[in-house]
């Protein structure tokens, strides 16, 4: 099955709302509309930027979509500092990242919490981008495939087969995030193919064939072409390279098979 690539730019804790507007405008200017027929493009700004991004996207009728970097597993209530899926849906978000390695590492989030957040996202009509990935010691020990499959199972626990069909999976080897090191295209394919095989077991082969599996970890315009050319890699979760509007647009154009005439 042909799956439309998704290029999602995770801004992490960068850019205030004024800077967010400038970056989205730069991306929109640098990536002509014709590319959006071949690639879905999303930005994932900090919470404080979302309303500004929504206003710009809606006002200028941009084909760019956007999402949030996290959400609460709770719908509302006395959870100081949490942001609910309902709030994100009202802000027009299409996606929400759950289980990013930085959340797992710095906030001690485990698979059970990630699964709860994914379920909450789906409940509110958001597409969760469920992140999994291994540290360098696991990779060097040759246990990277088994590690990712175990993390995948835990992070999707409790979801029905049809719900699994509504998620995006992002494979992000932790040792490649922000380091300049990048898994080879073959490395990415190995794990992403194993992920798809496990999705077929958890849901069905039909559903597994529809789920987009992204690669994340020092993705840039130089390597994205080789990565998305792999059979089971359907795009990228882009970090630092997404903060440069022109570079990010170039990256998305390559993922679309461009440059287009």
Swiss-Prot record:
Assembly and oligomerization? Homodimer.
Question: Gene3D superfamilies annotated for this entry?
Answer: Aldolase class I
In this chain, substrate is annotated as bound at 10-12, 178, 218, 239-240
| Any GO molecular function | triose-phosphate isomerase activity
**Enzyme nomenclature, EC number:** 5.3.1.1
Per UniProt, the enzyme's principal EC class comes to isomerase
* Superkingdom: Bacteria
Keywords attached to this Swiss-Prot or TrEMBL record, sorted alphabetically, are:
Cytoplasm, Gluconeogenesis, Glycolysis, Isomerase
**Temperature behavior of the protein's activity:** Optimum temperature is 37 degrees Celsius. The enzyme is stable up to 50 degrees Celsius. At 55 degrees Celsius, the enzyme retains approximately half of its activity but it is completely inactivated at 60 degrees Celsius.
- Which CDD domains does the UniProt record give? TIM (cd00311)
Q: What is its main location?
A: cytoplasm
Which BP terms does GO give this entry?
gluconeogenesis; glyceraldehyde-3-phosphate biosynthetic process; glycerol catabolic process; glycolytic process
Role according to the record: Involved in the gluconeogenesis. Catalyzes stereospecifically the conversion of dihydroxyacetone phosphate (DHAP) to D-glyceraldehyde-3-phosphate (G3P).
Instruction: Give the protein family.
Output: Belongs to the triosephosphate isomerase family.
Q: Where is the active site?
A: 100, 172
**Places the protein is found:** Cytoplasm
Q: Does the keyword Isomerase apply?
A: yes
What does UniProt give as GO cellular component? Answer: cytosol; extracellular region; plasma membrane
Protein name in the entry: Triosephosphate isomerase
Cross-referenced PROSITE patterns, in alphabetical order?
A: TIM_1 (PS00171), TIM_2 (PS51440)
Activity vs pH: Optimum pH is 7.
Q: Which reaction does it catalyse?
A: D-glyceraldehyde 3-phosphate = dihydroxyacetone phosphate
PANTHER family from the UniProt entry: TRIOSEPHOSPHATE ISOMERASE
């Amino acid at each position: 099955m042909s799956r439309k690539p998704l290029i999602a730019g995770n801004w992490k804790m960068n850019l205030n709302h004024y800077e967010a507007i400038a970056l989205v405008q730069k991306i929109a200017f640098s990536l002509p509309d014709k590319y959006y027929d071949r690639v879905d493009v999303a930005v994932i700004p900090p919470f404080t930027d979302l309303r500004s991004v929504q206003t710009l996207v809606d006002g200028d009728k941009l084909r760019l979509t956007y999402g949030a970097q996290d959400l609460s597993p709770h719908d509302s209530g006395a959870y100081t500092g949490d942001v609910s899926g309902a709030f994100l849906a009202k802000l027009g978000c299409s996606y929400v990242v759950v289980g990013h390695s930085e959340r797992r590492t710095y906030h001690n989030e485990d698979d059970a919490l990630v699964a709860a957040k994914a379920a909450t996202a789906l409940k509110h009509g958001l597409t969760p981008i469920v992140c999994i990935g291994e540290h360098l010691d696991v990779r060097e020990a040759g246990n990277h495939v088994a590690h990712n499959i175990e993390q995948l199972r835990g992070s999707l626990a409790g979801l029905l087969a049809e719900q699994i069909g509504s998620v995006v999976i992002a494979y992000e080897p932790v040792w490649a995030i922000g380091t300049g090191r990048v898994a080879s295209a073959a490395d990415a394919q190995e794990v992403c193919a194993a992920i798809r095989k496990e999705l077929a077991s958890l849901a069905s082969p039909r559903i597994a064939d529809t789920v987009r599996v992204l690669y994340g970890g020092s993705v840039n315009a130089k390597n994205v072409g080789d990565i998305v050319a792999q059979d089971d890699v359907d795009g990228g979760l882009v970090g630092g390279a997404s903060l440069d509007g022109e570079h990010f647009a170039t990256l998305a154009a390559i993922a679309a098979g461009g440059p287009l005439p």
